[in-house]
Every structure is written in structure tokens, then in C-alpha cells.
Amino acid sequence: MFIVVEGGEGAGKTQFIQALSKRLIEEGREIVTTREPGGCSLGDSVRGLLLDPEQKISPYAELLLFLAARAQHIQEKIIPALKSGKTVISDRFHDSTIVYQGIAGGLGESFVTNLCYHVVGDKPFLPDIIFLLDIPAREGLLRKARQKHLDKFEQKPQIFHQSVREGFLALAEKAPDRYKVLDALLPTEASVDQALLQIRALI
């Protein structure tokens, strides 16, 4: 099973994935956790470039870097893990690119979606389920403000992050069979309980 966790800045994806992984391991599942950009040596190298506020990368170059990292990530880590029977949980995937670069970033939702869905061939490589940790942009940014160092996207203005939130919710509305929206203001364990019910329904 391939699980993706999406959400805006400060939604608590890292804590959610850690807690969800722990519960699934306790149920006897083998879990591989990963993230984007990252998840492989190429992805980790690209991550540094993409998140560095000092790097002045054009929007189209940024998009192509995300896609290059994802193509390698899928082939090198995700597909082998799935073929070996493991459950993969990824912190971000296609829809983060569609929302951040396509919708909030202005490159166009359909244009970016088409590129994402053909990153490893003619057939889209999609997750079995997506958990969207939904949080108001202002609340998420307040959480992030407690950190000492913010990356390029975390430093963007609130209007950008509001567009990100609206973009994710719009995608979730279009694909209710794959998307499950969770309230990121709830305690993490409460969200994990809801997620486990959805995962068990798919098994």
C-alpha cells in the first residue's frame, strides 16, 4: 500500500507520519517512510537547492527539479518497497507539486498535473490513499514561526499559504475516493485513529 500525507506548512505531517507508522508496525506491517523532495541520494541533493532561500531558481526550473527528484525517488525507493510487500508512507508527493507550483505558484494546475502524472511513463503513478492534514494558513505559519530557520516556502507570505490550503481542499473535493481530509488542529493521535479506520477499509 502506498500512502501519501499532504498539507500546508505547520500541519504536523512529520509527527502524524511517525505516529501512524508506529501504530501500523504494531499491527504487524512493514513500513517504509520517505519524503519529498528527498527519499534518495538525488532527491536529497535536490532538496537542498529547492528549499534554500538564497537560491534564485526560476519557477520552471524549480518544477523540473521537483519532477527529476520524484522520478528517481519512485524508481529507486518507492516501487522496490511496494514490490517487496511493504507499506510506503510519503511526506508529500504529486499533489504538493500541483498545489505549490501549479496553483499557488502560478504555473497552472492542468499543466503541472500532466507533467506529474507522466514523470515515470504514460500511466500515472498514484497513491492508494492521501491524507490531507488541513490547517488554516495563519495557524500553520504561527506554528512554523517557533522554528529558528525557515526554508524558502515557509518564508512565503500568508496569501501564498492560503492559496496552498485552498488548492489542496479543491483537489480533495475532486477525488474523495482517494483523499481523506483530517483536521490538523486535533491531537495527532485522534487524526491517526481516523486514518487507521480508512486504511483498514482498504485492506
Swiss-Prot record:
Q: Which Gene3D superfamilies does its entry note?
A: P-loop containing nucleotide triphosphate hydrolases
Binding residues annotated for ATP, in chain numbering: 7-14
Which Gene Ontology BP terms does the record give?
dTDP biosynthetic process; dTTP biosynthetic process; dUDP biosynthetic process
Q: Which Pfam families match?
A: Thymidylate_kin (PF02223)
Is Nucleotide-binding found in the keyword set? yes
Primary enzyme class? transferase
| CC terms in the record's Gene Ontology section | cytosol
A single Gene Ontology MF term assigned here is:
ATP binding
Q: Does the keyword Transport apply?
A: no
Q: What reaction is this protein's catalytic activity?
A: dTMP + ATP = dTDP + ADP
Mind listing the UniProt keywords for this protein, alphabetically? Answer: ATP-binding, Kinase, Nucleotide biosynthesis, Nucleotide-binding, Transferase
Give the enzyme's EC designation. 2.7.4.9
Described purpose of this protein according to its UniProt entry = Phosphorylation of dTMP to form dTDP in both de novo and salvage pathways of dTTP synthesis.
Q: Which family does it belong to?
A: Belongs to the thymidylate kinase family.
Which PANTHER family does the UniProt entry name for this protein? THYMIDYLATE KINASE, UMP-CMP KINASE 2, MITOCHONDRIAL
Task: Write the protein's name.
Answer: Thymidylate kinase
Gene for this chain: tmk
